[in-house]
Amino acid sequence: MTESLVLSPAPAKPKRVKASRRSASHPTYSEMIAAAIRAEKSRGGSSRQSIQKYIKSHYKVGHNADLQIKLSIRRLLAAGVLKQTKGVGASGSFRLAKSDKAKRSPGKKKKAVRRSTSPKKAARPRKARSPAKKPKATARKARKKSRASPKKAKKPKTVKAKSRKASKAKKVKRSKPRAKSGARKSPKKK
């Protein structure tokens, strides 16, 4: 009886081995997509349809190739291997993203430049324009600070608080001149 129990799992193991013997007659879809984009060399990128045509004409793929291509395009977009030039999702046009070395070196330079310029811009408006004309200076400050705030990481809280006060002050000051300007305009038209 114990022998019959041992024999039943033995035939199940070879079935698993048979399932792993499958071999594809083509490279991976991601490799085929990259080859299709390289071969097309279009300025605006390659569309999904043109990629599908290229793959079907150059490789032996199954009947579900369109679905596999669409899914692998999405994966490549998420991984950053492809860059989408037009459209949304798997539709549109695609290019191969530039190599990591090319991306990293300009990225570091840009960050360094941003850090050096943002404190200078923030320091100048506070010192130079605060003693100047009050109503115009507050409007200019609020605009410039709101532009500079996304670049800064350390001081956005103080900038936001001041810009809110300035925007409230703007509304009060603007409402009075608008009423006057409206009264002035109506006699001119008549």
Curated annotation (Swiss-Prot):
Residues 25-98 form the H15 domain. It is found in: Nucleus; Chromosome. Residues 1-29, 87-190 are annotated as: Disordered. Signal peptide: none annotated. Transmembrane segments: none annotated. Residues 13-24, 104-190 have a biased composition (Basic residues). Pfam families: Linker_histone. One of its GO terms (cellular component) is nucleosome. The modification Phosphoserine is found at residues 23, 30, 146, 167. The keyword Nucleus applies. Erythroid cells. Keywords: Chromosome, DNA condensation, DNA-binding, Nucleus, Phosphoprotein. GO terms for molecular function: double-stranded DNA binding; nucleosomal DNA binding; structural constituent of chromatin. GO terms for biological process: chromatin organization; chromosome condensation; negative regulation of DNA recombination; nucleosome assembly. InterPro entries: H1/H5, Histone_H1/H5_H15, WH-like_DNA-bd_sf, WH_DNA-bd_sf. Belongs to the histone H1/H5 family. Histone H5 performs the same function as H1, being necessary for the condensation of nucleosome chains into higher order structures, and replaces histone H1 in certain cells. This is Histone H5. It comes from Gallus gallus (Chicken).
